[in-house]
Amino acid sequence: MLDAEQISSLQNDRIKNLVKLRNRRPRDQQRIFLAEGYRAMSRALEKGIVPREIYFSPDWFQGENEMDLLKRAQSQGSKLFEISKIAFEKVAYRDRPEGIIGIISQWNYSIKDLALSNPPFLLIVESIEKPGNLGTILRTADAAGVEAVICCDSVTNL
């Protein structure tokens, strides 16, 4: 059984904050980012990235594994909030919501933190505006064996 706080009001402070977090400035100020959808949340947990908070609405679930994912996240320390269908519709930023949004703390790495070969195989990109373009670049870099991608002057939220 999940231990989740119930939220139904659109006037709830947490819902209002989630709506604000759709914009980059509040996310940067709070040093967090949002991950929406089953796949994003599942991959985060697989990599040891535990969301601070997860907001979910079973009315939007598209599969059968969401509850198991929520149990796993809660066992690793995520605080869960079950929100109404209407509230989720308001906070979701994807065209087709999947019923799960996580708040994850930002982290920073320096090039000194990376274990690179000598000489390193790096890709440096600048002013990537569209998330889809960045995704294509990352997949291509991975396929080519690039060790690190350095994003300069990023317009896309990483």
Task: Locate the predicted segments by residue.
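Gly/Ser-rich helix-loop-strand patches that form or flank binding pockets
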Residues: 98
